[in-house]
A protein has these predicted regions:
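Conserved core of the PLP fold type I
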Residues: 1-133, 144-161, 165, 232
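Short secondary-structure boundary/capping segments
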Residues: 17, 156-157, 201, 253-255
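Conserved glycine-rich beta-strand-loop-beta hairpin in the small C-terminal domain of fold type I
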Residues: 54, 229-240, 251-260
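Walker B catalytic acidic pair
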Residues: 139-140
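Conserved core segment of the aminotransferase class I/II
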Residues: 160-230
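Inter-domain helical "communication" segments and dimerization helices
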Residues: 217-221, 244, 248-255
């Protein structure tokens, strides 16, 4: 609904530093539906790069859409940019804020190199036949649950060339039964989506959309996330304390405790 898109746009502006007009937000019943729409939007003739290790079903979902997938290894700072270049992929699906399952936070250098990779041929990236050039699918998985420090700014907030598709879902924060996800499209991709895919009916219940819009508008969602984050931090602190007080203290090392 327009009201939910506006609520999400306001949330992204306030908490993720993203300036995205509501009309460039697409809502769907879960992230997997969005992955399928991205393939239809960008085209099946592309190679999609996915992180390895990564979300186990992602390659299968893209493969079911008849696109070729390239599995790209991770370095300490995120996706291996050299391997990405060598793969011939024109779409990179990444989780910069909190990579699953490793928990890696993409480094500033890797973010810069990834954005530079995507900008190659950006000046001629669109045609009457559809979008060309390279794109990044930024899956902002788990970004709300960073335990300490400043939130990790999304790639989308510094994307000046219109190469980043931003994805997020409410499933992690509101429960697996709450199947609402969304993506924020760059301006020209949003126009392509409206032209070629705008006929799709939204599969999310209007009642659920209205309820979520009000939940966000009234500040309940942010307070809910803060409570979850506080509870998770208490559980984490308790686990770490017990391990450090146990006979395992010399055998176990913790890292990335701020990542969620």
């Amino acid at each position: 609904s327009p009201r939910l898109r506006q609520a999400i746009a306001s949330y992204l502006r306030e908490y993720r530093g993203m300036e995205v007009p509501a009309e460039r937000i697409v809502i769907a019943a879960g992230s997997q539906t969005l992955y399928q729409l991205i393939v239809q939007l960008l085209g099946r003739e592309r190679t999609f790069a996915t992180e390895c290790p990564g979300y186990p079903l992602l390659g299968r979902i893209y493969g079911a859409q008849n696109v070729h997938c390239a599995s790209i290894p991770l370095s300490a700072g995120g996706i291996d940019i050299a391997a990405l270049r060598e793969s011939g992929a024109s779409v990179a699906h990444v989780m910069p804020a909190h990579q699953f399952p490793t928990g890696i936070v993409m480094s500033a250098a890797c973010r810069r190199d990834l954005l530079n990779w995507s900008r190659t041929d950006a000046a001629r990236a669109f045609s009457a036949a559809g979008p060309r050039g390279r794109f990044i699918v930024e899956d902002d998985y788990d970004a709300e649950f960073r335990m300490s420090g400043r939130p990790i700014a999304p790639l989308s907030s510094v994307d000046v060339a219109g190469r980043v598709i931003y994805l997020n879902s409410f499933t992690k924060s509101l429960g697996a039964a709450f199947r609402i996800a969304y993506m924020a499209l760059p301006e020209e991709l949003a126009a392509q989506f409206e032209l070629n895919l705008g006929f799709y009916s939204n599969t999310v219940s209007p009642l659920e959309q209205l309820a979520l819009a009000r939940f966000i508008e009234q500040g309940h969602y942010e307070r809910h996330v803060n409570r979850l984050r506080t509870h998770a931090k208490q559980l984490q602190d308790g686990l770490v304390r017990r391990v450090r007080e146990s006979s395992l203290a010399e055998e176990v090392a913790f890292e990335g405790l701020d990542r969620g």
